[in-house]
Curated annotation (Swiss-Prot):
Glycans are attached at residues 3, 7. Residues 1-18 are virion surface. The gene is NB. It is a single-pass type III membrane protein. This is Glycoprotein NB. Coiled coil: none annotated. It comes from Influenza B virus (strain B/Maryland/1959). The chain crosses the membrane at residues 19-40. Keywords: Glycoprotein, Hydrogen ion transport, Ion channel, Ion transport, Membrane, Signal-anchor, Transmembrane, Transmembrane helix, Transport, Viral ion channel, Virion. It is found in: Virion membrane. The keyword Zinc-finger does not apply. Pfam families: NB (PF04159).
Amino acid sequence: MNNATFNYTNVNPISHIRGSIIITICVSFTVILIVFGHIAKIFTNKKNCTNNVIRVRERIKCSGCEPFCNKRDDISSPRARVDIPSFILPGLNLSESTPN
C-alpha cells in the first residue's frame, strides 16, 4: 500500500507558473469587465434620469435611478413630495373633493 506515493520531481515549474499567470489574467479581466459594466450602468441611469427631469416638468417616476433624481429645487423629483398613506391618518380626509 506504500505504492501510492507521488513523484513531483518531473513537474516543470515554468509551465506551472505560466498556467497560474494565465488563470490570474483571465479572472482579473472578468472582474474588470464586471466593474466597468456596473459603472456604465450607473452613468447610463443617471443620464436617462437627468434627461427625463429636464424634458418633463411634472412629477416623474424614475425607476432605477432614484438617487440621481433627488436634486435641490427640483419639483419633478419623486422624493420631493411626501405621500401619507391613508392608514396612518384614518380620520383625516386629504382628498380635494368636498363632502356633500
